[in-house]
Amino acid sequence: MAVKRDYYEVLGVQRNASQDEIKKAFRRLARQYHPDVNKAPDAEAKFKEINEAYEVLSDPEKRSMYDRFGHAGPTAAPGFDPFASADPFSSIFETFFGGTMRGTQRGPQRGADLRYTLSISFEEAIFGVEKTIEYRRMETCPACRGSGAEPGTEPVRCPKCGGLGEIRQRAPLFNMVTVTTCDMCRGEGTVIAIPCRECRGEGRIRQTRKITVRVPPGVDSSAQIRISGEGDAGPRGGPYGNLYVVIDVQPHPFFIREGNDIILELPLNVAQAALGTEVDVPTIEGTERLHIPPGVQNGAVFRIRGKGAPFLRSSGRGDQIVVVRVVVPTNLNDHQRRLFEELARSLENEPIGNQRDEGFFGRIKNALGL
């Protein structure tokens, strides 16, 4: 029976080496003796020896046992490996089915979702628009195709869990077995012995992405547009996540949006309000002629049908709500003052203050049916 070499000697480290030093030594030797890279006849045997040494020395509990008892372990029974994972179910499986029971390994993980805030104008929100955006995301490494391993090599079986993706430990009391995800391979069952130079073993690289986003008519601020598959790439070749484009509509100089209705304040002077007039009212599509009857009051509301924002999930559009604002002059010349004084005398017997004023916002609520 061949005598096993000292594990510290195999990795070329001191007995008081730190975990970081042990890990660096393992990576260096694994790269040197990996069978896909080193074609020497004894390369595979040396690679297995390096994996075995690292499996023990990278685990504090196994390393402590090895430091105390060496290869034999505390119970030097022939054929007994004190550093093998305690898995009573595995031996039963092998007895009946001639195979090895493997722990449940995680499949490819989906990449993270990303968010992008897209600023658009008021008009673009009403009519819709196509915008080209540019953002950064993680993409699958083209060199290793997401595996993380140097091209021409493959990930190797995890030396800590033996490829199970989990660690089984027998509790000293109650004869129970606890199962935890392997912290070395993170449940994948394999580790990267020779990392890809392009992505440094990550399997992904950060790239700039440029795409065209179609913004539908009638969209409003805080709306989200989901673009499938445009988020980050998943680790180890996993599928891409989604990109969520969050809409930010810039305010308009004089239009205010309320749901699918568009509100406009229309300033009128005192004469126009008293005598009535015809005015060209600006809308999102141009101007509309609006008749203002004589005696219109401040805060009066007029509705122009079908001149609001389109409904997102159905046909039709909202309305434009025109709210009258009577502007009282503040600087009168002598002639205007005399005219107002004469008007005031003629209105001395007219009742005032006996009408309930609902206020500006009250009138708008009534117009909107709120």
From Swiss-Prot:
Signal peptide: none annotated. CXXCXGXG motif repeats lie at residues 141-148, 158-165, 182-189, 196-203. PROSITE patterns: DNAJ_1, DNAJ_2, ZF_CR. The keyword Transport does not apply. It holds the Pfam family DnaJ_C. Residues 6-70 form the J domain. Zn(2+) 1 binds at residues 141, 144, 196, 199. Its cofactor is Zn(2+). InterPro entries: DnaJ, DnaJ_C, DnaJ_domain, DnaJ_domain_CS, HSP40/DnaJ_pept-bd, HSP_DnaJ_Cys-rich_dom, HSP_DnaJ_Cys-rich_dom_sf, J_dom_sf. The J domain is necessary and sufficient to stimulate DnaK ATPase activity. Zinc center 1 plays an important role in the autonomous, DnaK-independent chaperone activity of DnaJ. Zinc center 2 is essential for interaction with DnaK and for DnaJ activity. Homodimer. This is Chaperone protein DnaJ. It comes from Roseiflexus castenholzii (strain DSM 13941 / HLO8).
